[in-house]
Amino acid sequence: MAVSRMAALSLATCTRVASRAAMSALRAPAPALGSLQTAAIAPLKAAGFSAHQMVQRPTWSLTRSFHRSPVVCAELTRSLSRSPSGEFETLEYRLFFQNDQGETLSPWHDIPLRAGDGLFNFICEIPKDTSAKMEVATDEPGTPIKQDVKKGKIRYYPYNIHWNYGMLPQTWEDPSHANPEVDNTMGDNDPVDVVEIGEKQAALGEVYAVKPLAVLAMIDDGELDWKVICIRADDPKADLVNDVDDVEKEFPGTLTAVRDWFRDYKIPDGKPPNKFGLDNKPADKATALRVIQETNEFWAKLVKRATPRNGLSLV
């Protein structure tokens, strides 16, 4: 099929538009993808808007597709910008994603999974050497990035994470699926997590291509929480690592360090260590690719309403 025809089919898929006129008048220009600025919200507070009413999402235009061509994928990710609302590290903070027309896109649903040439798009939720527990809000329209909250307070890890951490778009760990490879453990109802081990610190919300290398089957509170180990495609060592054994050669001790970090990070809060399936070892690239494929299929069923959405936002 010609690329132009594939692009036309992709852009015609699942378009849905709604507007918020009152918010549109107050909306500030979106910053470029490489910058991160806090949006001015004083006029909204003065007008009496609540914190969640101040979220800037006046226009929805979803161009979701299950099979975008690499050309369409590249054009979409290049045109992305990030639009913050509220003060960083507060309950009100949200980071939205927009295209070059200023239309809000869901980082979970609208950014394509595949980036071409065996690579996948990665969305950084927690930059390396930081501790604020940021995450895509899967239950909010637009699925912006926000800081995790527990008992009304924003959450932090007890210490910095040493790698870029985030998620693969268009994936979902189905909580109704019992995985036979991991003692029939059910999915955790979230997108698949990624630990990106490259040397560069990513920006919050940065989207870039990564190469999968290995995967850990973490079991958190009885739920399966895959951790796909990746490296960014433009890292100086990206060409030297292609599978789990290469990681140990080029990044000695890293796989053990990743496993131990995620095993132990809840201990300072008085909780037991997390467990791991697959013999407590990182599995190879082939297993990682199977996990990505399977969870992409779970996501496709979710957005087609073939699976109960369990309070998740599909826009």
Each predicted region: which residue ranges?
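Hydrophobic N-terminal alpha-helices or hydrophobic patches in metabolic proteins across all domains
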Residues: 14, 27-29, 36, 43-315
